[in-house]
Amino acid sequence: MDARRDGWQVNHKKIQRLWAEEGLRVVVKRRRKRIGVSTVPEIAAEKANDVWSVDFQFDSTITGKPVKILSIVDEHTRECLGGIVDYSITGLDLAEQLDVLAIDRGMPQALRMDNGPELISNAVAKWASETDRVFIPPGQPWRNGFVESFIGKLRDECLNVNQFYSLNHAKGIIGIWKEEYNTIRPHSSLGCSTPSVYAGQCTH
């Protein structure tokens, strides 16, 4: 029976409390996550430089200063190509980092990225206009599976087990971890090769 339809003043929180007191199941409507729409079709990473994934993490120093961590991963070779560790990272910072990587490795076919404010800045949009951008819808981090796996390892194996006394200390520790990830850690998906070794063997 709809109490509102019959003219009753209804307080939904009070009704939920009364239902709970009577042992009745309270159904709570949850907001659906907003799902965005990719601006270009999904592109499979079938060779090196097909798709670079970009994402951010956050940590802090022992004094409470926030630290931003940018990671760029090649989805095919699993290499961590580069990144930035700083108190703040702008779209221009990211564009400059991508320029450096493009000069060293060549341009990627696609740039898979989160829709964060840094990534939609004018500087990034201008750079990404030269590639086929692939946007990951907000609230759907699993769509960016390769870089999400990488930053999960970075979180569990580096950020969660280290205290950073300064920004430079954070840069050093994170840099060492990324180097070991690329050169020492074998990946089953790469035939138990390290990302660096596999990248050197890629001819397709």
Spans of features found by a protein language model:
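Charged DNA-binding/catalytic regions of mobile-element recombinases
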Residues: 1-204
